[in-house]
Structure formats: C-alpha cells, structure tokens
Amino acid sequence: MPREIITLQLGQCGNQIGFEFWKQLCAEHGISPEGIVEEFATEGTDRKDVFFYQADDEHYIPRAVLLDLEPRVIHSILNSPYAKLYNPENIYLSEHGGGAGNNWASGFSQGEKIHEDIFDIIDREADGSDSLEGFVLCHSIAGGTGSGLGSYLLERLNDRYPKKLVQTYSVFPNQDEMSDVVVQPYNSLLTLKRLTQNADCVVVLDNTTLNRIATNRLHIQNPSFFQINQLVSTIMSASTTTLRYPGYMNNDLIGLIASLIPTPRLHFLMTGYTPLTTDQSVASVRKTTVLDVMRRLLQPKNVMVSTGRDRQTNHCYIAILNIIQGEVDPTQVHKSLQRIRERKLANFIPWGPASIQVALSRKSPYLPSAHRVSGLMMANHTSISSLFERTCRQYDKLRKREAFLEQFRKEDIFKENFDELDTSREVVHQLIDEYHAATRPDYISWGAQEQ
C-alpha cells in the first residue's frame, strides 16, 4: 500500500531544486525525461508510485505542483528535455507574472488572491491518490514567493488537510556574502513563524554551508546555483530512498519523522552526507565501510548547516537517523552503533535515550556509483537554534531603524500596524528558548512552566 507524497515547488529556488530532484528520481528509477520507463529498467522492486503516477498510456508523471509568481524558471523547465514529464495542468503561473519582488508581504497577499486556483490543483492531485500521506514543500525563506506564498500555503494546508503530514525542504540564505535582498531578515523571520507552527518537519538546507562545502570539499572555485542544487537534490533523493526502495523499516514518511522528532516544536532537521563527490567517473580511493560512513557523518564538516560556536550552551543531539545506502552487512551496523556509543562520538540530550536509528536502503540498480556505501544523516540537533538567532539579530538591526518597512506597508496584512512582524519575532524567540531548554535535564518539565 503506497503512501503517496505530493511535492509542491514554490518560487525560483523551490522550482530549481525541485527540477533537480525530479531529474535525480528519474535517473534512479530508470525513467526517461519523457516519463517512459527505459528498456533496461526491468527490476520491479522499487516503488515509483509514492512520487509518480501513471497516465493512461503508462508513462510516469510526477505528483508535483509547480507554482511561481513570475515565469522565468518554470519557462526554463518547460524548455528543457524534461518538459513532457510534468502534468501541464499542475503548473500555475500568476496572470500578470510580476513576481513578488522579494517581498514576503506581496507573496502572502497574492496567495490570498489566487489560493482557489492553487487548491484546485492540489485537491485534484490529492483526490487522485489512494492514501495520501502528506506534502513536501520546496522553497527558500529569504525571497518573496517561496517565503510569502509558501507561508500562506502552509497555513492553508493545515486547515485543509489537518491530518496530513507537511514536510518542507527550506533553503536558508547564504550569510557569507552580501544579499541583494535587503528585506531578507524580515522575509526569513515571517516564514520561520509558519515553519514553526504549520510544518511537521523542516529539513534545513543552509546555503552558507552548501557553498562552503562546494568550495572546500568539492574544490569548486565559485559554485554555481546549479552545482549547489545538485548537492540539494542528492540530499533530497537520499532522504526519500527508504520510501522508494522499501525495506522493513522507515518505509513511510511518518516512520522517518517519528524517530527524529520527540517533541512537536523541535522539528528542524539538519543533514550530513558522505562521501561527497561531484564527478561520478573519479573513483575516490577511500574505504567505505559502515563504521567509516557513520563516523564521517558525525564530523561537523559533513553537516550541511553552519551553526555558530556557543560557549554557554552545551548543544547536543536530540535524535539521529542515518540512512545508509549500498552493500551493507546488518551485523556491521550493530557493531558500528556500539562503537559510536562507547566512544561517545556524539553528545546526546540528558533527558532521553541516545537515539541513533539506522535505516538500510538499497541503491538504485541503474546508477553507477564510485562508492560501495554512502550515507545520509538526518539529525535533530539543538545547535540549529544558532541559525535562528542569526536571523533574529539581523531582523533586530533593521526593525530598530524601521528600515525598508514601506514596501510591506503597501500590503493589507501590514496596512494598520506591524504586529505580525513582532509576533513572528516572539514565536521564533520561544523556539530558540525551547532548543536551549532541550540541552538541560529538566526540559521535560520546561513545557509545563510555560503553559
């Protein structure tokens, strides 16, 4: 019984990473850019129908909804070899095509105007699935469409489908270089409020670190968007392998999320991946045993979120899920886990068990790989709060001077006052406090004092 997942791609960033994700899925399942199963793809043990459905003529169509308020990226997808892959009815471009101008308020209020058209598409897609498990939303939090329209959709999805899971892949802005979006801290904070309140699970893709990894580890001088998006699609496809190549564990989304998120608000996950290579043809001369892979996943340099050093707080893991792909002997897994615990290679919360789960998954038979074993770590770690602290600091600087607020005042939500900004700041501040509380043994009773 497949539990289907509908992917929603929003804005420039969401559609670009979504495009790479579908390219990767097609390659892994032996599906051509037109959606036709390749001649050599005869192994019937994968589950294509979690992410695809079949048209009348048997070709595969992604369960994806592509939304944007300006046409550039979606047009480039429609002019690519993968143009015929998508269902044209699932592509929504706003009439006037002016975009949201990197303004959260504009994206949000356009969402209010066009939500009926968008939900017609989403409802049709949901009705077409046997037992829909949830939605995956790809977007960035710094721009206008991904953040504003994304926030609006998150709120509405909760109202419309209260029992369905909502997982997001959220791209956080690059802090190493100057942003061309001056209101980025406002956009990010307003979106973070929705990610805290309306999503079940947020996979944080931090552009700062992705750029550093591309430069330092993959030795790319000036990484392009395309190369960064390939890294992202690797993470996205690896995090869904257990759904597509089902084993006896973690073969649905709730199984993945449940082991990682013991308390509902602390649902921001970071990822790590090893071994990282861009060039498939270069076989890296490294031994990849399960222990090597698991040990490397715990090294900070493989983790794809840049967290600041915090001397006051003893940050720790709340839970870890390692998805290991390749030729693995299950007894090795047990030994590796024991060794990680004995050597205390990971520092865990004081109020619960040291939860390291391992999901074994097959590799796609159709893709050549230079490594016997590769691994993805999805970790719930309290230091992710430093990312939110950084956003709050930048927000406070702008808010104190009331900088750039006139762009927001044009929209209905900010006509009267800026309460929405201040409540968002409050929500994110509480989230940071809760992450700090989770590093202390008395966290279990912390919630009770708050109520």
UniProtKB/Swiss-Prot annotation:
SMART domains: Tubulin, Tubulin_C. GTP binds at residues 142-148. Phosphorylation at Ser-131 by BRSK1 regulates centrosome duplication, possibly by mediating relocation of gamma-tubulin and its associated proteins from the cytoplasm to the centrosome. One of its GO terms (molecular function) is microtubule nucleator activity. PROSITE patterns: TUBULIN. It is found in: Cytoplasm, Cytoskeleton, Microtubule organizing center, Centrosome; Cytoplasm, Cytoskeleton, Spindle. It comes from the Eukaryota. The modification Phosphoserine is found at residue 131. Coiled coil: none annotated. The keyword GTP-binding applies. GO terms for cellular component: centrosome; cytoplasm; gamma-tubulin ring complex; mitotic spindle microtubule; nucleus; polar microtubule; spindle. Disulfide bonds: none annotated. One of its GO terms (biological process) is mitotic sister chromatid segregation. Its main location: cytoplasm. Keywords: Cytoplasm, Cytoskeleton, GTP-binding, Microtubule, Nucleotide-binding, Phosphoprotein. Tubulin is the major constituent of microtubules, protein filaments consisting of alpha- and beta-tubulin heterodimers. Gamma-tubulin is a key component of the gamma-tubulin ring complex (gTuRC) which mediates microtubule nucleation. The gTuRC regulates the minus-end nucleation of alpha-beta tubulin heterodimers that grow into microtubule protafilaments, a critical step in centrosome duplication and spindle formation. Belongs to the tubulin family. Component of the gamma-tubulin ring complex (gTuRC) consisting of TUBGCP2, TUBGCP3, TUBGCP4, TUBGCP5 and TUBGCP6 and gamma-tubulin TUBG1 or TUBG2. TUBGCP2, TUBGCP3, TUBGCP4, TUBGCP5 and TUBGCP6 assemble in a 5:5:2:1:1 stoichiometry; each is associated with a gamma-tubulin, thereby arranging 14 gamma-tubulins in a helical manner. Gamma-tubulin at the first position is blocked by TUBGCP3 at the last position, allowing 13 protafilaments to grow into a microtubule. This is Tubulin gamma-1 chain.
